[in-house]
Amino acid sequence: MTQEIITSPQNQYVQEARALLSQPKARRKLQAFAAEGARLVEDGLRSGVRARYLLARTTHPARVDAVLSQCPETLPVLLVEDKLFDSLADTVTSQGILGVFELPAWNLPDGLNFALILDQLRDPGNLGATLRSAEAAGAQVVFLTPGTADAFAPKVVRSGMGAHFRLPILTLDWETLAVVLAGLNVFHADMEGELSCWEANFRLPCALLIGGEAEGISPAAANLVTR
């Protein structure tokens, strides 16, 4: 860990982390995202997703020290003056540590037989909760369609509770998605659907399509539905 304490808001690391927390464009350009909090950073370090650097509040709890002790020697860990770190943090109460990680370069899993498709979900909390539920349910991959919220926005990452480090999350155009889903039963999760979820056969290769909070699924997504 560097012993020099960062005090300037113009510091390169501080500016970059701030941009990653607030700008989707910066996340795309830098191919990176920020994860805040001891649990998330620890999950990231254990996952194999490449960490670029960590920022730690000068005054931080013992829980943060426990995370820092797991860092490889080659990983830059920089101390940030307390007020400056608090201004950078996206949470109301700073947890004292923030990690910048590369966006995972996921590939399509072999033998795809259980996927989740999210179409036009726009609430970050809902998206993050759905991602962690997908991981818990054993989904092999989550596909995001055009118009869905940025999966690596800070509120989504927090709500995902580490799913971002373990679950492949891919944003695909409609044409590619149709090819990938060929051969799978695509179920639309619809409150007014004729088939009960208890009657659906999810043991067959399938994908579950969930629409947005306000508008449901788009016409393009509806074209994918087989059941």
Where on the chain are the PLM-derived regions?
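Boundary-proximal intrinsically disordered activation/regulatory segments immediately upstream
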Residues: 1-64, 148-149
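Short acidic-hydrophobic, aromatic-tinged amphipathic segments that line or gate anion-handling sites
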Residues: 4-8, 76-81, 167-176
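Short glycine-rich anion-binding loops that position phosphate/pyrophosphate groups of nucleotides
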Residues: 38, 59-60, 84, 104, ...
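Short, aromatic/basic amphipathic alpha-helical patches
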Residues: 62-74, 220-221
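Active-site/ligand-binding-proximal alpha/beta "capping" segment
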Residues: 187-227
